[in-house]
Amino acid sequence: MVKSFLIDLFDGHLIFENDGLKVLVDTGCPVTIGKSTHFDFMGQSYQCMTEFGGKGIAEISAMMGYDIDVFMGMNIIEQFHIETDYQSKEITFSTEEIPFDSICSIPIIRGRMGEVCIDLTVKGQNIKLALDTGARISYIDESFTNGEPVVETRDDFNPMIGNFSTPIYSMEASVCEQIFPVNFGKLPPVMAMPLKMMGIYGAIGFDLFNAFTVLMDFKKNMLSLKCNT
């Protein structure tokens, strides 16, 4: 089964509509959060939590400034092959492999705590970053931003800690020898410390998906890329 949806990139968030419900896709969350305890999608009914970390859909929507109905996490996402094309504003879910003429494929690294990561190169160092479709701002450990000029300050939120502000650093990252621009923020210490203990140096979100058409194959744990022209 395969189905494509138009996406609404509200402030960099990956959102689509399914049967009248606004759905935010977030590979950074292990569970799905909804207004009810189930979500019908692609011919299946999936379990939802009504709260995660003490936050429900109403609280998440308020932090975003956008009303969503479902916060789709990895318990649903990992069931599919998913292609995102931000230039065409389209996301495709498939239960079968999706034909994809990629420039390269890299492993998706799955952690014991449910984290989903990939390796990128920043400032000549190969580092592990969380792959987060829900992140409108990418983040990196402050050791990489030392000496970099702050280009602006932006507001962001995390369902676990609420709203916060971060300085933004305009930098570059590379994958498969392809260089792309990234506006990195600085993670709050409460988020940075546990990630670093797992060898994770931040999170890559909107910037990667805006630079490439991306195929996430969670059956084989591979991520494939095509350059957006």
Residue ranges, per PLM feature:
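Pepsin/retropepsin-fold aspartyl endopeptidases
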Residues: 1-229
